[in-house]
C-alpha cells in the first residue's frame, strides 16, 4: 500500500492518492517477482461526497480483494468536486481532466500498471459513481468496465424543467452554471445522458453495472435512467435491493 502526496498541475494544489499494489506470494523469489516486468490490471476507485481517498481502505476489504486478484487499485482524492473541471475558481481545479490527463500517465509510468483498455476498470460510490460514469461515457476507449454504486447519469433537461420540486435541482443547477449555462452544459463532457446512446451503439462498449438500494434517495433517478438505458439498448446490469 502506497500513499502519495504530490503537486498536481491540473488541480493547482497538492493532492493525495492511495495505491494498492500486488503482493509477492509466499515462497516466490523476490528478485524474479520484482524484475518480472509483468503489467497488472488497474481499478480506478472513486470516493463519494464528503469522503476522501482512504474511504475504501478504512471501511471495506478492498486491499484483501486486490491482493487476491493481483489487481492495482488507485484511489484519488477528489474533495467535493463532483469530478468536474472548476474553471471559475482561483486557481482553477480541473478534477475531470486530472484523472485521464495526469494521474493515469503517472500510474502507467511509475508502476507496473497495464494501460490496455481491457485491463482498466472504473468504479465509484455516489459522487464517485457520477464521476465513474463521466469517465466511462466520455472515454469509453479507456475502460473495459464501469461500476456505479448509488449514482447514475442525470437527465438534466427533465431536472431543469421540474425545477425546485426535483430533489437534485439545486446541485445540477450549480453544475449547469459552472458549465456556462444549459447550452454549454449540453455540449460538454458533463452531459453524460446524451453520450449514453452513442456508447450503446459501439461495437465493443465497456461493460456497465449500476446498483442502488430501494430506500436510497437516488432510487427514482436510478429507475428513470434504467428505463432510458433499456429503451436505447445499453447493455448493462441493473441491480436493486
Across the structure, where does each feature detected by a protein language model lie?
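Non-catalytic cap/lid and distal C-terminal segments of serine-dependent acyl enzymes
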Residues: 1-241
Amino acid at each position: 500500500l502506497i500513499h502519495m502526496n504530490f503537486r498536481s498541475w491540473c488541480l493547482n494544489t497538492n493532492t493525495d492518492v492511495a495505491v494498492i499494489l500486488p503482493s509477492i506470494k509466499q515462497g516466490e523469489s523476490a528478485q524474479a517477482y520484482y524484475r518480472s516486468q509483468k503489467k497488472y490490471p488497474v481499478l480506478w476507485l472513486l470516493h463519494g461526497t464528503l469522503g476522501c481517498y482512504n474511504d475504501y481502505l478504512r471501511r471495506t476489504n478492498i486491499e484483501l480483494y486486490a491482493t487476491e486478484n493481483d489487481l492495482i487499485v488507485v484511489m484519488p482524492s477528489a474533495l467535493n468536486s463532483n469530478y468536474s473541471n472548476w474553471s471559475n475558481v482561483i486557481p482553477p481545479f480541473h478534477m475531470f481532466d486530472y484523472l485521464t490527463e495526469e494521474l493515469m500517465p503517472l500510474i502507467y509510468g511509475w508502476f507496473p500498471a497495464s494501460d490496455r483498455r481491457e485491463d482498466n476498470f472504473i468504479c465509484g460510490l455516489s459522487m464517485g459513481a457520477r464521476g465513474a460514469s463521466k469517465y466511462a461515457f466520455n472515454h469509453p476507449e479507456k475502460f473495459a468496465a464501469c461500476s456505479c454504486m448509488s449514482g447514475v447519469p442525470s437527465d438534466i433537461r427533465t431536472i431543469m424543467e421540474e425545477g425546485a420540486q426535483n430533489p437534485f435541482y439545486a446541485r445540477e443547477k450549480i453544475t449547469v452554471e459552472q458549465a456556462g449555462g444549459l447550452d454549454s452544459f449540453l455540449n460538454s463532457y458533463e452531459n453524460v445522458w446524451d453520450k449514453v446512446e452513442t456508447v450503446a451503439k459501439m461495437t465493443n462498449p465497456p461493460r456497465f453495472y449500476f446498483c442502488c438500494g430501494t430506500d436510497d434517495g437516488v432510487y427514482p433517478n436510478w429507475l428513470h435512467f434504467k428505463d432510458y438505458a433499456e429503451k436505447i439498448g445499453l447493455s448493462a446490469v441493473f441491480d436493486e435491493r
